[in-house]
Regions:
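General small-molecule cofactor/ligand-binding pocket signal
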Residues: 88-95
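Short, Asp-centered acidic motifs that coordinate Mg2+ and/or phosphate
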Residues: 174-175
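Short, well-ordered beta-strand elements within core beta-sheets of diverse protein domains
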Residues: 6-13, 143-145, 242-243
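Small-aliphatic-rich amphipathic alpha-helix that forms the alpha element of a beta-alpha
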Residues: 167-168, 204-227
Length: 284
């Protein structure tokens, strides 16, 4: 979906499980217009050997939104851990202007959403009504649901050009390291965005000021992962986000396995309760 920008994987407790599921699901869907190259070996095998020393680009901010001190400490601590494992970390800036990037992305999302809803209406025999949609979907359709074919094509070409820029950037780097979020994980309900009075630029501001890093790799097609290596003062995990070159998922998984061994996270549980035997019990 979204001209190739929407791809699914999983959230797992271990790198082993992530690699195993990728082994089970990897491969090109017949006739798909976009596909990553097939790996030479299984992803589970990639975990058996430490990665070669990697050139890691440390990116602390993208776009106009500041990164909080906690997020900066989380990513810098991850960088120090990588250096201790033999990798070389250097500061870098990504070749993207984020407001322009997001405008193109939402042009594609708006046109795609309009198309999906029209198809759904045809399948069920009645048009989809605005009241059946969430407010944020209505906001996107209001601003981007009637773009022209030329505007849609231009947005896709813009995203393709961005992918080429990122490929050039990756000639000098093996991996990009950034925060996953600009601040501590948001309280439940904060990102609800169910307010029809919001303009699209306000919706984008509210969400992408919180998470500006990850969408870039949906667009470039690069494999990426969030690894829990730091906990906030409130005991919440703050991810370090890593991205590799297009098709180099095995490099990321090997790095993740190395990080997991050096700084395990599976034993970390919520300070309030933990699920034991299907029931909730106090954590110890």
């Amino acid at each position: 979906g979204w001209a190739g920008m929407s791809t699914h994987h999983c959230i797992t407790l271990s790198v082993r499980d992530s690699a195993g599921l990728l082994d089970a699901t990897a491969g090109m869907e017949l006739g798909a217009p976009y596909a990553a190259p097939m790996a030479a070996h299984s992803y589970a095998q990639a975990l058996q050997q430490a990665p070669r020393p990697l050139r890691i680009a440390l990116v602390e901010q993208v776009g106009p939104w500041p990164t909080s001190s906690q997020s900066l400490e989380a990513v810098r601590q991850a960088a120090r851990l990588c250096e201790s494992l033999g990798h070389r970390v250097t500061s870098a800036q990504l070749p993207v202007v984020l407001p322009a990037f997001l405008d193109q992305v939402f042009t594609i999302i708006g046109a795609s959403t309009r198309n999906y809803l029209d198809l759904l209406g045809q399948l069920r025999g009645t048009p989809v009504q605005p009241g059946e949609l969430e407010a944020r979907t209505r906001i996107i359709l209001r601003d981007k649901g009637a773009v022209s074919g030329a505007q849609y094509a231009a947005a896709v070409e813009w995203i393709h050009a961005f992918g080429r820029q990122m490929a050039l950037f990756m000639r000098d780097h093996d991996v990009i390291l950034s925060p996953t979020l600009t601040r501590e994980p948001a309280p439940i309900g904060e990102l609800d965005l169910q307010d029809d009075s919001l303009r699209l630029d306000e919706l984008i501001e509210r969400f992408h000021s919180y998470s500006p890093f990850t969408a870039l790799f949906n667009a470039s097609g690069q494999p990426a992962m969030s690894v829990p290596l730091y906990w906030s003062a409130n005991g919440l995990p703050m991810g370090a986000h890593f991205a590799a070159r297009f098709g180099e998922d095995a490099t990321l998984l090997a790095l993740a396995a190395q990080l997991e061994q050096a700084q395990p996270w599976r034993q970390r549980v919520a300070p309030v309760n933990a699920c034991v035997g299907g029931a909730f019990a106090p954590a110890t």
